[in-house]
UniProtKB/Swiss-Prot annotation:
Alphabetical UniProt keywords: Cell wall, Secreted
Organism in which the protein naturally occurs: Solanum lycopersicum (Tomato)
Domain of life: Eukaryota
GO CC annotation terms, alphabetical: extracellular region
Subcellular locations according to the entry: Secreted, Cell wall
Protein's UniProt name: 35 kDa cell wall protein
Length: 10
């Protein structure tokens, strides 16, 4: 899934 840049993906 793709998240907005406001969320941190680690």
């Amino acid at each position: 899934e793709q998240f907005d840049e406001e969320f941190d993906i680690t």
